[in-house]
């Protein structure tokens, strides 16, 4: 039996960065808000303190902060002719399942996406002609501009304690920063993290090649900091336990220690953990949503939570899944090229080289999530001529360390036996002496990369699993080959003792090894309901009181990590709801 609860002004599904931002902003505006999070509450003092957090087996190998694939997963295939099979263990990407979401266990890399992404089709057609874009590449403009988002990027960076060096303030190029970035109103809230040896060596080599290295902006506080909301950060300890871990020092920007505690102190807010939302409910004419149904996973009780506004703020994949399960918006059909929900799923590509320097001591166990140096000469540099190389998109190149832990980090030169005495000797010899140079590359939307509901497999609640159909296309192969050439050229100029050269990802994509937790698309934003699921305010074209906030609204994927625009869009959407929608409920953009 389902228990119907008292109606609230807004219900939030998923409480990570986006849900936390909306919870804080809407409760402060006077709305009664309930947040439903299927994960557990974790706090720094109880769950991420030393020695608890220094457990690679628990947090990295056994995915303690991640979704449990025995209860819910996806089915995976490379193309529509294949049978999709369930992902039985996490690999390629790692969605969080905890209060605070994936922001609890991320590295902190925080970028500003620019009009090169938001106006991607217009800009490429203008520069290279319409025929340059492949017929099956379904990229489109997003319907928003960098100028509109700039104040919200700024707000997120100051909330999340981003450390970095501005490259462009008000149109004036700044020494030491990224000269290709779009103009920002002011400097980062904190100076960059301390450069490590690998980053210093890469910086010198990149400059010799005529490139423009700069410290990677990251939500790892380089010194103690109090953000504008009063949330207090400690300084990064360079402990090496960053990606896949909570932060012992409260130095990593995370919703669980910033916006969420602020919301929880507000009497207008209620958090319910272990609450798995199974469906968004619609009224009789299907033009409004009326709330959600959810199950308490600890005891199996089922509830209906009525609400005036429904906000989908779960991980990107789960937001799309819930839209499909709830029958909101037309499901995408790749053959007919109709429908919008499930359309334009994108991932990222890349290439990397490992360099070995006999006699060097890199101390890779001492690092931060953002202790990298990056070049954007082949990324947001519009002077880089893609036409010569025949691909749409871009990549950034970086060097440094993130998490070099004893179980997972064992760099050895190619040709080393994979086990036994020689392997042991090689891991001991090369652990201290190796560094990495890697590229993160964009993936453009393609007609045949999409989500839909699996016809065979179901989750613990008897609902169809999400089916992901994805593979890299020739565009990504070309991009990856170019990235590998640039990486190898820089690497060879550094004269390593041994070099595992970079190669492009040209084999079919596989879900098995970890690559990145940067899944985008599925309920994309746009200018009209024919091509997109939500408008520029992330409001559903079909049900005006439904908003979905996350990387699922991205119309393609860039080379950058998505959290910067995700956070900015959350503040942007909160602003639109507070100042426009609540005063006059209805579509914020005419269809």
Regions found by a protein language model. Give the residues of each.
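FAD cofactor-binding and catalytic pocket of flavoenzymes
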Residues: 78-83, 87-106, 110-121, 125-126, ...
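Conserved redox-cofactor binding core of oxidoreductases
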Residues: 59-61, 67-74, 84-92, 97, ...
């Amino acid at each position: 039996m389902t228990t119907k609860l008292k109606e609230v002004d807004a219900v939030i599904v998923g409480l990570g960065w986006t849900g936390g931002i909306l919870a804080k902003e809407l409760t402060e505006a006077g709305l009664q808000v309930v947040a439903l999070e299927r994960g557990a509450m974790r706090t720094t003092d109880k769950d991420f303190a030393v020695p608890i957090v220094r457990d690679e087996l628990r947090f990295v190998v056994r995915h303690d902060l991640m979704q449990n694939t025995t209860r819910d997963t996806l089915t995976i295939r490379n193309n529509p002719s294949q049978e999709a099979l369930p992902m039985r263990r996490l690999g390629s990407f790692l969605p969080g399942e905890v209060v605070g979401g994936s922001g609890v266990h991320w590295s902190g890399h925080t970028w500003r996406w620019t009009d090169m992404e938001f106006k991607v089709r217009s800009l490429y057609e203008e520069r290279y002609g319409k025929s340059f874009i492949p017929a099956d590449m379904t990229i489109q403009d997003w319907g928003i501009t960098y100028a509109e988002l700039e104040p919200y990027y700024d707000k997120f960076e100051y909330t999340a304690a981003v450390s970095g060096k501005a490259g462009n303030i008000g149109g004036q190029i700044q020494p030491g920063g990224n000269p290709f970035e779009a103009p920002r109103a002011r400097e980062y809230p904190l100076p960059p993290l301390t450069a490590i040896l690998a980053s210093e060596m890469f910086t010198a080599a990149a400059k010799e090649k005529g490139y423009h290295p700069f410290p990677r902006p990251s939500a790892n506080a380089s010194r103690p900091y109090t953000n504008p909301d009063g949330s207090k950060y400690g300084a990064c300890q360079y402990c090496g336990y960053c990606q896949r871990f909570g932060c012992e020092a409260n130095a990593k920007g995370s919703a669980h220690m910033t916006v969420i505690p602020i919301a929880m102190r507000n009497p207008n807010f209620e958090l319910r953990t272990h609450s798995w939302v199974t469906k968004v409910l619609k009224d009789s004419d299907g033009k409004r949503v009326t709330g959600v149904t959810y199950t308490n996973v600890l005891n199996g009780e089922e509830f209906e939570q009525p609400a005036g506004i429904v906000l989908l703020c779960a991980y990107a994949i789960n937001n799309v899944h819930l839209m499909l399960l709830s029958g909101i918006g037309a499901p995408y059909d790749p053959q007919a090229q109709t429908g919008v929900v499930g359309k334009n799923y994108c991932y990222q590509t890349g290439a990397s080289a490992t360099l070995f320097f006999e006699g060097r001591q890199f101390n890779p166990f001492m690092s931060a999530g953002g202790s990298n140096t990056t070049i954007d000469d082949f990324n947001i540099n519009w002077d880089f001529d893609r036409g010569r190389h025949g691909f749409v998109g871009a990549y950034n190149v970086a060097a440094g360390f993130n998490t070099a832990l004893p179980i997972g980090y064992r760099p050895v030169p190619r040709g080393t036996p994979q086990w036994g005495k020689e392997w042991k000797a090689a891991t001991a010899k090369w652990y201290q002496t190796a560094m990495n140079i890697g590229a993160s590359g964009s993936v453009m939307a393609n007609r045949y990369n999409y989500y839909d509901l699996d016809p065979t497999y179901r989750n613990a609640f008897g609902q169809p699993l999400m089916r992901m159909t994805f593979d890299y296309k020739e565009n990504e192969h070309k991009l990856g080959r170019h990235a590998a050439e640039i990486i190898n050229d820089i690497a060879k100029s550094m004269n390593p003792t041994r070099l595992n050269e970079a190669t492009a990802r040209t084999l079919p994509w596989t879900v098995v090894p970890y690559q990145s937790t940067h899944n985008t698309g599925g309920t994309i934003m746009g200018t009209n309901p024919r091509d997109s699921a939500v408008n520029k305010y992330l409001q559903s074209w079909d049900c005006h009181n439904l908003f979905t906030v996350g990387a699922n609204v991205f119309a393609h994927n860039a080379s950058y990590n998505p959290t910067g625009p995700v956070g900015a869009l959350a503040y942007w959407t909160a602003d639109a709801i507070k100042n426009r929608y609540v005063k006059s409920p209805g579509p914020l953009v005419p269809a």
